[in-house]
Regions:
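C-terminal helical cap(s) of enzyme catalytic domains, especially alpha/beta-barrels
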Residues: 123-130, 221-265
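Short, acidic/polar
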Residues: 36-49, 96-101, 158-169
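Short, small-residue-enriched loops and turns at beta-alpha junctions
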Residues: 62-68, 96, 144-147, 184-190, ...
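Hydrophobic faces of well-ordered beta-strands that scaffold small-molecule active sites
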Residues: 2-10, 56-58, 86-92, 111-113, ...
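Catalytic cores of alpha/beta
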Residues: 87-111, 126, 195-234
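N-terminal beta-alpha supersecondary unit
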Residues: 14, 18-68
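N-terminal active-site wall of soluble small-molecule enzyme domains
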Residues: 49-106, 194-197
Length: 265
């Protein structure tokens, strides 16, 4: 299983996300780079050099909330000599082919299309068609298990769609990589929704399945892997030092669904 460090960017600063309350996000102080509070460049370098990460997830909170894409910062991050072997995934609120290409032009390896900014699954299918399915990750954005929908999407999907039905529509649109992201769990250490992850894996066995929100310690990652997760997004636990380079190396050697003897059941 891959452990994917997270950079949340607000006005050029790396911030600490907590429970999805974006108004309260503060510059992040990380054990990886003491003294470099809120410095996204220093953090990205540390993710590779000190943590041994092979990929990174970047959320442009300005763009997600309707502002301009932080083009200069995204380009600077993408051009760093980090030696990343995997993808730099960027969520910058893209919801059309044009806005997706804008993010790719900033150096993203993959673009995250978030449920909270997507207008329709027709748009998602068109993005996958013109960009290529390997460059698209669909994010099922949740709050306490309930989908976060753009007002237009509410009209498209009908009343009270659940995460599994929305994932089914994303798969029909051509998506092959999916992220389950519960904003209410982010930065809380309450653990991931293992029941939902397991249900996603059983229903959609061919998907590359990622999840984020709620990781506190190594045992959370073991349980996510055992539930069928291919990759986990982690921020707070990395900055606190409870997830280390040795954890990343150990988990990279084990496939999703492999039972871990370190998990207490």
């Amino acid at each position: 299983m891959d452990i994917i460090p997270v950079l949340d960017l607000s006005r050029g600063t790396a911030v600490w996300a907590q429970a999805g309350d974006r108004a309260r996000y503060e510059p992040v102080a990380s054990a990886l780079v003491p003294g470099a509070v809120g410095d996204p460049v220093a953090l990205l370098k540390a993710f590779r050099v000190r943590l041994g990460a092979s990929s990174c997830y970047v959320a442009d909170l300005d763009a997600i909330q309707g502002g301009a894409v932080q083009r200069a910062m995204l380009r600077e991050l993408a051009q760093l000599e980090t030696g990343f072997a995997g993808a730099i995934m960027v969520d910058a609120g893209a919801h059309t082919p044009e806005s997706t290409f804008e993010v790719l032009a900033c150096g993203a390896s993959q673009v995250v299309i978030g449920l909270e900014t997507l207008r329709s699954f027709t748009d998602l299918a068109e993005i996958v068609r013109v960009v290529g399915r390997g460059r698209v990750v669909f994010s099922v954005d949740l709050r306490l298990g309930s989908p976060i929908l753009h007002p237009t999407m509410q009209d498209v999907t009908g009343a009270n769609p659940d995460a599994l039905s929305l994932t089914g529509q994303a798969v029909e649109a051509g998506v092959c990589s999916l992220l389950v992201l519960d904003l209410a769990r982010i930065g809380t250490g309450c653990g991931a929704d293992l029941g939902l992850i397991g249900a996603m894996r059983r229903r959609f066995p061919a998907l590359r399945l990622l999840a984020g929100g709620g990781v506190l310690a190594r045992r959370d990652l073991d349980r996510m892997r055992d539930a069928g997760c291919d990759g986990a997004l982690v921020a707070s636990a990395i900055h606190a030092g409870t997830i280390t380079a040795s954890d990343l190396a150990d988990l990279a050697a084990a496939p999703a669904g492999a039972q871990s003897p370190s998990v207490s059941r």
